[in-house]
Curated annotation (Swiss-Prot):
Other comments on record: Present with 48100 molecules/cell in log phase SD medium.
A molecular function (GO) term: rRNA binding
Positions carrying N-acetylserine: 2
Gene: RPS18A
Organism expressing this protein natively: Saccharomyces cerevisiae (strain ATCC 204508 / S288c) (Baker's yeast)
Protein name (database record): Small ribosomal subunit protein uS13A
Length: 146
């Protein structure tokens, strides 16, 4: 195994991707998971689509590779990532498939809950009351309230 010496100024300890600080010391597949809306499977797929070495540290990547990764994460359908892989399929407003990232995840979730409360759906009412939403038993559990 040969020793590869990197240039001194090329390693970045902290990267800024999609309004999130990403640690440059960990491998790129796991470093991308610090971005909200990106899990290990999605991160792995994006790195493969961007032709990035999966064993590289995040701080070792060039600016071009990082831009390619961000571009694929923001427009996954243009890079033949299937719709079932995305976290927002058949959106309620326009019926398209999206993958929401970073700050957008929280705002979309908040909008969905507000819509459910507004139309007085069962799930919305349970959220409003602070009760369990997904059909769990509540006779003996979940009594502690904030």
């Amino acid at each position: 195994m040969s020793l590869v010496v990197q240039e001194q100024g090329s390693f970045q300890h902290i990267l800024r991707l999609l309004n999130t600080n990403v640690d440059g010391n960990i491998k790129i597949v796991y470093a991308l998971t610090t971005i909200k809306g990106v899990g290990r499977r999605y991160s792995n797929l994006v790195c493969k689509k961007a032709d990035v070495d999966l064993h590289k540290r995040a701080g070792e990547l060039t600016q071009e590779e990082l831009e390619r990764i961000v571009q694929i994460m923001q427009n996954p359908t243009h890079y033949k990532i299937p719709a079932w892989f995305l976290n927002r399929q058949n959106d309620i407003t326009d019926g398209k498939d999206y993958h929401t990232l970073a700050n957008n995840v929280e705002s979309k979730l908040r909008d969905d809950l507000e819509r459910l409360k507004k139309i007085r759906a069962h799930r919305g009412i349970r959220h409003f009351w602070g009760l369990r939403v997904r059909g769990q038993h509540t006779k003996t559990t979940g009594r502690r309230r904030a």
